[in-house]
Amino acid sequence: MKILVANDDGIRSPGLEHLVRMARNLGEVWVVAPSGQCSAMSQRISVFGTLDLQPVPDYPVEGVRAWTVSGSPADCVKVALACVMPEKPDLVFSGINQGYNVGTDILYSGTIGVTMEALANGIPAMAFSTENGEDLRVADAWMLPLVRELLEQPIHPWEVWNLNFPSCDPDCLRGVLYLSLIHI
C-alpha cells in the first residue's frame, strides 16, 4: 500500500512524525508537508506565484521519502500527485493535528483540507487529531489498531475518516465512538 502523509502543522511537527511512524507499519510512505505552520487554511490552494518544493534528506523516520512545500496543506497533496509520487497513492493520511477537528472546526481545518483534496482526486483519506498535540499516548496506543480495523472494510474514494484522540491515559478509554459528518 502506498500512503501519502501530509499535515497543516509543518514538516517538523512531532504529530507528523508519530503519524509517519505508524503509517510505516502499513506500507510505503511518502511525506509532503508545508514548510511552516498552516493551520486553519481549510482547502486553500496557491493560484498565483510559484511553490518551492524541497527534499528533506534528514527526515527522522528511516525509509521514508519526505519533501516540504512552501504552500498550503492542500497544495502539498497537489504537488505530491503532480511532481513527487510516481503513482497515485492508495490512501492519504493527514495529521496528527494539535487540537481536535470536530464540529464546525472541520470547515477551517488544514488537516481536513488535506483529506478534502485527496477526496477531490479520488483517493480515500484519514485525518488524525489529538486534544492538545502534546500527549499522544492514546493516539500511539489506538491509531494502528483502529486504522487496521477501518481498512478491513472496503474504503471508498469518496470517504474521509476523521479520527480524534483524547489526551489522557489510554486505560481510561471505554471504546470508540463512530459518527457520520451529519452529526457535527
Model-derived regions, located:
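A cross-family phosphate/adenosyl-ligand binding-site feature
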Residues: 3-6, 14-83, 87-88
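Hydrophobic/aromatic beta-strand patches that form the interior of the parallel beta-sheet core
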Residues: 30-32, 67, 126-128, 161-163
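Glycine/small-residue-rich loop that forms an oxyanion/phosphate-binding "nest" at active or ligand-binding sites
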Residues: 91, 95-100
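Glycine/threonine-rich flexible loop motifs
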Residues: 100-109
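Class I SAM-dependent methyltransferase SAM-binding "motif I" and its flanking Rossmann-like core
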Residues: 116-131
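Short, glycine-/small-residue-rich phosphate/pyrophosphate-handling segment
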Residues: 127, 131-149
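A charged, well-structured terminal subsegment
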Residues: 145-173
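Conserved small/polar residues in nucleotide/adenosyl-binding loops
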Residues: 182-184
